[in-house]
Amino acid sequence: MSRLQDFYKSKVAPDLQAKFGYKSTMEVPRITKVTLNMGVSEAVADKKVIEHAVSDLTKIAGQKPVVTKTRKAIAGFKIRENYPIGCMVTLRGQRMYEFLDRLVAVALPRVRDFRGISGRAFDGRGNYNIGVKEQIIFPEIEYDKIDALRGLNISITTTAKTDDEAKALLTAFSFPFRN
């Protein structure tokens, strides 16, 4: 069991149950999955770009991502149907907790001019999204070996019913919110 998962079961879950007055431990919000998505629009011109994005995301997540393809052709963007346009990976269980631990403790503090993450990026149903501008904030990515700086979206899906419950959950996991 990872450090963060153990911390959730021993400290976070009982605290949230007391704070929100849940009758059952199954009502307590928990993180169900973390989805990492990297959109690579340059892949239209150069097919090798998608391979670099896949290798970067594999290093970051510790799991091979699936290549996302376009659903329909759009002439204005010069894309055809089934063109590889990005990659995504879904983390659950132990890998998810280990990734979140690395994200909060190592990666986010390495962001340039970091003052905390926005407390307004909740979707109204208890899920949270973080946009990362550069993949080099993760220690697994070596600066000398990357071909271009790429951003990625991190979606944290929880079982929380409201944004307040989700924010309390993520704050308990020591996410550095600025507001």
Swiss-Prot record:
Signal peptide start-end: none
UniProt record, GO biological process: translation
Assigned keywords, A-Z: Ribonucleoprotein, Ribosomal protein, RNA-binding, rRNA-binding, tRNA-binding
Family matches, as Gene3D superfamilies: 3.30.1440.10
Gene Ontology terms, MF aspect: rRNA binding; structural constituent of ribosome; tRNA binding
InterPro entries reported in the protein's UniProt record: Ribosomal_uL5, Ribosomal_uL5_bac-type, Ribosomal_uL5_C, Ribosomal_uL5_CS, Ribosomal_uL5_dom_sf, Ribosomal_uL5_N
NCBIfam families: PRK00010.1
Subunit structure: Part of the 50S ribosomal subunit; part of the 5S rRNA/L5/L18/L25 subcomplex. Contacts the 5S rRNA and the P site tRNA. Forms a bridge to the 30S subunit in the 70S ribosome.
PANTHER family per record: 60S RIBOSOMAL PROTEIN L11-RELATED
Job description of the protein: This is one of the proteins that bind and probably mediate the attachment of the 5S RNA into the large ribosomal subunit, where it forms part of the central protuberance. In the 70S ribosome it contacts protein S13 of the 30S subunit (bridge B1b), connecting the 2 subunits; this bridge is implicated in subunit movement. Contacts the P site tRNA; the 5S rRNA and some of its associated proteins might help stabilize positioning of ribosome-bound tRNAs.
Name of the molecule in the record: Large ribosomal subunit protein uL5
Gene source species: Bordetella petrii (strain ATCC BAA-461 / DSM 12804 / CCUG 43448)
